[in-house]
Amino acid sequence: MDRKVAREFRHKVDFLIENDAEKDYLYDVLRMYHQTMDVAVLVGDLKLVINEPSRLPLFDAIRPLIPLKHQVEYDQLTPRRSRKLKEVRLDRLHPEGLGLSVRGGLEFGCGLFISHLIKDGQADSVGLQVGDEIVRINGYSISSCTHEEVINLIRTKKTVSIKVRHIGLIPVKSSPDEPLKWQYVDQFVSESGGGRSSLGSPGSQENKEKKVFISLVGSRGLGCSISSGPIQKPGIFISHVKPGSLSAEVGLETGDQIVEVNGIDFSNLDHKEAVNVLKSSRSLTISIVAGAGRELFMTDQERLAEVRQRELQRQELLMQKRLAMESNKILQEQQEMERQRKKEIAQKAAEENERYRKEMEQIVEEEEKFRKQWEEDWGSKEQLRSPKTITAEVHPIPLRKPKYDLGVDPEFDPADDLDGGTNKRGEQDFRKYEEGFDPYSMFTPEQIMGKDVRLLRVKKEGALDLALEGGVDSPIGKVVVSAVYEGGAAERHGGIVKGDEIMAINGKIVTDYTLAEAEAALQKAWNQGDWIDLVVAVCPPKEYDDELTFF
């Protein structure tokens, strides 16, 4: 082995693998491969330590250590990572859906991977593969998205644009407490219950056709012998390969079936014709099926060992499949539990909303009943009361500070009379509000609940001079105006009075704000722009007696 290659390889191993035991295992596997020269076993053993996407570059680093004759087989057995992104477009409204299942997300500590494809479905038809990592959806990177956020992003458009790169691994996490693990696509049992055997052990590799190119110029011959197969297995097979020969160099082995040479089909040729074709040219393009007739040239001991080996492999594969299916079963149970939990949460929320609606209806009914009772009890008495007894003066609202803030009794002008007080109230009830405002565009019917909701635009001239009280955490349960001071922008506007509920400030709903949060939002809005928009629920007009003091 070239020292520079070995040094670079060790450096990459140290960089990608921190665990010393795993490093030792990797070097032991490579030493055993150079003794047995079994590529399939090597790749199967490597997959046990190259078990996450960040370690996949090790396959490329190991490739220079593989003899030339085994590199084609090595490339076939190792996952083919794609560095380039592939973009496809899927119709979200297709009757059969997108045709894929995905795993992963930010909450699992990994990206989003395709774990299952419906055969001949949309995703399968456009060339997506199990083990593809989804990088972008509709132009947005999903590297910091949870699983649910990605699903919601897919639902935003009719045509879904997906960019993927092939990794060849799938994330597996059976429970929240279990660390994240990865499985190769050929080892993964999909949600449909099917699975494919791993290519990582001998005997599991399917017979695959491959081509070799041989130039006989300057050589003594191929260095192999051929023979015809029996009646039950016709064809031309390689019966012997001379060590160190040209055939051995290109990877031909005993038991390989020759299916074509220089475009001539060997399936119906007899032994003599096959020999003539092989000797007819100094440049040969040979198509073979590796190992197709290996059992024809095995000894009894080799056959017995092969049977034992296959049985061990079968048991191992069955165990892997059972483990994979059990993992999927646990995942499906967890998904069902999560769906049930969300369903219960939604049901409780609906029940809570219904209970709140009934309570509010009951409160409204009780308030209406109380109002009617009050009118019945006091309305008739007011009609019988002599006008001469109403000799009290009107107590006006303090012009600069509310009564409880001044700490002194307000002064009354003896010239004020009952009619003057009535005019004062009439001016106060005048509201300047924006017409055409639809409160249902901002609030739910439960939030409005019969209120007279208006949009006011207050020009910023001087100070607002508006005091608030209450808040969602107070007995009042809402933010209301406690005072409107004379000379302020609110008083000059004329559309805000004490008792009005503040529902929104500059488009921001404050029905669930505390007093401190509402005051901060009001101050922030007042410091921005030339106007401030306030959405208020108008305080119901007070009874006339509330504005009078009797002596």
From Swiss-Prot:
Coiled-coil segments on the chain, per record: 318-377
Claim: Coiled coil is one of the keywords in the record: yes
GO biological process: auditory receptor cell morphogenesis; brush border assembly; inner ear receptor cell stereocilium organization; protein localization to microvillus; regulation of microvillus length; retinal cone cell development; sensory perception of sound
Cellular localisation: Cytoplasm, Cytosol; Cytoplasm, Cytoskeleton; Cell projection, Microvillus
Record keyword Ion transport present: no
GO cellular component: brush border; cilium; cytoskeleton; cytosol; microvillus; photoreceptor inner segment; plasma membrane; stereocilia ankle link complex
Bias (Acidic residues) ranges: 408-419
Keywords: Cell projection, Coiled coil, Cytoplasm, Cytoskeleton, Differentiation, Hearing, Phosphoprotein, Repeat
Oligomeric and partner information: Part of the IMAC/intermicrovillar adhesion complex/intermicrovillar tip-link complex composed of ANKS4B, MYO7B, USH1C, CDHR2 and CDHR5. Part of a complex composed of USH1C, USH1G and MYO7A. Interacts with F-actin. Interacts with USH2A. Interacts with SLC4A7. Interacts (via PDZ1 domain) with the C-terminus of USHBP1. Interacts (via N-terminus and PDZ 2 domain) with CDH23. Interacts with USH1G. Interacts with MYO7B. Interacts with CDHR2 and CDHR5; may mediate their interaction with MYO7B at the microvilli tip. Interacts (via PDZ 1 domain) with ANKS4B. Interacts (via PDZ 1 domain) with DOCK4.
Location (main, coarse): cytoplasm
Region entry Mediates interaction with MYO7B, spans: 194-532
Protein name per the record: Harmonin
